[in-house]
Amino acid sequence: MDPDLFLRKVSTLQAGFRGFLVRRQFQSLRAEYEAIVQEIEGDLSTLQWTGGWIPKPVFLPEAKSHQSWKAEKISNPEQKLWSHSPHKDSEKELIWEEMVQKKTEKSPANPGSLCRDDSAWPQAEQGRKASQGNSQDTSVSKMENADLGLSQSQQELQEQRNHLAMELLWLQQAINSRKEYLILKQTLRSPEASQTRDKHRGQAYEKTSLHSSCVLDNQSYRDRIIGESHHAEDSSHKGRLKPQKHPDSVTSAGKTTAGSKGRELCYRNSASQLPAALESQAGGDRVTKGPDHGGQPFKETSLQQLKVLEDQIPGDLKFRSPCSRKAETQLPTLSENQNIEDRYSRKPSRSAGPCDLNILEGHMIWDETLAGQEQGSLDLIRTKPPKSQPPSAGSSGHGNTSELSPEGWKNRGILQWR
């Protein structure tokens, strides 16, 4: 056999087998493709295959296909209904005509009844047509619901209604929450809201600053009162104890400086209690003092004041006052020694406001009084006799002090220091 002929026959056989296998494979592919389209679309009405030996899938427009499918579905029930309805209508018409004829035969002499029957017939006909239309509408709606896969039972419809109501409620709540969020965001970004926030912050800061300033003012007021009382007491005692540089008073100066240092420490501890005690004593004097007692209440308050000061001073720092106990009891008429007065001449103190110091002829008379019934401080007044009177006019041989006017005795008690 010729080898060329053999090769041609073998090649044609192989081509036939290859064509068969390819066609078979394409058929399997078409079946798989149609199965996928059926699963997705639910119908193969929109799919068409075009081409010769190798077909190609083509999809028709979806809107047209859907409308045509719906029209077919709707037209078929109508045709069925209309196909059944003519026979029924004809039968009903025949029955109605027979009934009318029977009535006319039974009562031919009553033409009014015939008129009434004739008028009732069109009304019945209209009602029959309306009922037929309603039945057709309901049948069409049922068919559409069946095509769409909707349930027809009452329970399923109620469940669907509840489900739709819950979805609508959820949507409404979501819309309301979104609106509230946007409104809040807008108000926070607006300048008016920032101004109100700054205003509230400023008011809160003013309240806190006012409260702190009130506390600081009260504290500074208390410190100032205590400091003034300390300063007045220290200045008065320094004025009493500071002598002039005289050869006879060198030894007493050291004692007075040591005593003044000790008293400063003690007065700082007792200063907080001293103004209250003086005020209470002044109030008691205000109540008990009569018009005829003179300077007796002031004398008692001066003694009580000295006792309070001595009690507050420790024993090792107590200042030995040059004034004796006898001089304290005999406050209005204390003796005066002229030599000692010359030794204890004092300079006026700048810090002691109520102290008035005057120097005349070496006679030094110290009056320790209360500055007022509301003031809890000591008033040191240095008095001098007029020039027309001799220095010893108002004093005895034992050194008694010069007597003041009765008004002076009523207003102050005099404490004479030697």
Curated annotation (Swiss-Prot):
Coiled-coil residues: 141-176
Domain of life according to the entry: Eukaryota
KW Coiled coil (keyword) present: yes
Domain IQ: 6-35
Record region (Disordered): 101-142, 230-264, 280-299, 327-355, 376-418
Polar residues bias locations: 129-142, 249-259, 390-404
Keywords: Coiled coil
InterPro entries for this protein: IQCC
Protein name per UniProt: IQ domain-containing protein C
Source taxonomy: Eukaryota, Metazoa, Chordata, Craniata, Vertebrata
